[in-house]
């Protein structure tokens, strides 16, 4: 560390900065020999590609410190064999040893402790330490800021156990690395943040750092050695659009390098964490427990995507399979896609939500190398193949000087497509062939036919809750309905089939500053696509958008069995009372539903709200232990004694409680609430983990309005209901697209929001992972506002009007919300 750069990596959270929001945009590329011929020329061509992508990188106030650059190649066995006498040990045959590139503390004491921990773990895992090698570097060639945070860089050589094949060695090296990360980061070493293992493999090695592209061979001098050979080379130049550069966050990672942003990262992390409790693998056996947590906190979105790729690949899937699972193409509305390929995608949708966002991902395991584009094609990828079997792919054309007459074929990556080179089979594999091979792995279509149903397959309920017109005004008051909600939101939505449009600009107070009782929804704002992250036009690009979701207890993502698609498919997340009753009375396979009340006793005062939430969370845990797979969180039953818990608070509290408990993937959470009525309300509930939402009071309110003649005479109730549901669906798609997200499945649990005016303790406990840059009220204020609305609803008729509050959020009203220009 130094005064110039007081951090060893990414700075800690402070002020308005939070390292959870790290993203970057970059240049990627690779070069490979289709024949698998190793040469130093491939390495040098990779370096040249990296240098020619330098304009896609960046530097800060120090022009010699880059945002990060790196190169991945195959293990240069001939080079290490030649260096063996100087290293003091001989290297075994290729495939019988692994090499790790290790970033270590600069302090000698801390470094020796880290080395000792790694050596201990290697021995405990049954492998043999051959020795350590100081990686020859030239620190004088990099900028002063890069030097200030530069780790000590060594290589470790590990021999496999007798009779261990190379795939088993790769898995064991993975276990060793995960154990070393966990144990060293758990120490109190002052310089433990320097520790990082860029690669530990028997197939590949990574040279990377806080470098500019032209510095890579000056810093890592051995890359210029003619004996450093490879049949493939993956390179990356980083541009930290809104992040702090660091040595750890330079690409490539162990399997991928990435240009883009994973917009759904928080949700992907949460779901991966929830799945850990059921992970089983015959390849890992008991070692699977040593890999937890799978996703390493504190990494970038690309690093966490690589964590997921690494687990799924080493558990037995091919890299193209894994990439198609994590970043699927748009399949739902594609009528030209073969049914078997569509079945492949739908089966895996039951296992894993897409890691969504603009992305061009290049990947390799040291044998195959390729690239994948996101479903929207929002990042560039250009490739060419020469007559002598050289393949080049990069973020742009022209990264290598190749004569036109030497080019056999060239093109660009299309949205959702894969470009693949197999150096062992010595051939280029087309996207069509990759998808056909994946679709033929299992009888996915048959599994779906036998195990997946929709709501239409469930029997009709014998009883559906009808509208209670006598109490509707009381319930509207209790849930904070205003006259403006009815006339400005609900009526236009049900008349026109789309969300009402208003002019830009808000001159009303923030929820935390208002003197009117507020809904919890009003304390949240959705983040939106910015910098290099484009939004999507959900209308013109409807082919890539999807509202599909899957309800059911999730299986083990490391195995492919028919029971993994034992799911109930929902085509729309907002459901009617009739469809909710179908779910409430479901009796099919493992599906069993129960209702949990979202109510708190008003007489208990402000403290009762928190106690009731804790009780709700305990009830959810007990329901899971009792075998229930559908938990319906309901606030029906509001009366003089009970007030509703804010539905968003209850939903997020249960969702995060079950994630921490490791049982979230065993249940679907369905919200039956009188509170949600506009698009943002539904987006928030879904964004914090709801599988479906039943807005029973909004539906009853529309029915009451229809009954009272608020709609044109010729408008039937069926048309009113369908138009309202259509408006919510269209509004949700528009809301997803503002953040560059295409599918509901990715949006669920992704928490693409920031709070404004909620205090840190409330957010950390109930909305874990949500940004709260500006703090404010706590749970006691939320309880007070809920009680105020309840008291207003329960006032005797002679003490109050029968009307609702006027509102005044969208238009100034005398008794309504204050405006800047009243």
Predicted regions, residues:
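Glycine-rich phosphate/ribose-binding loops and adjacent secondary-structure elements
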Residues: 2-39, 183-198, 203, 208, ...
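Flexible, glycine-rich loop/tail regions that form catalytic "lids" or insertion modules at the edges
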Residues: 66, 79, 295, 312-359, ...
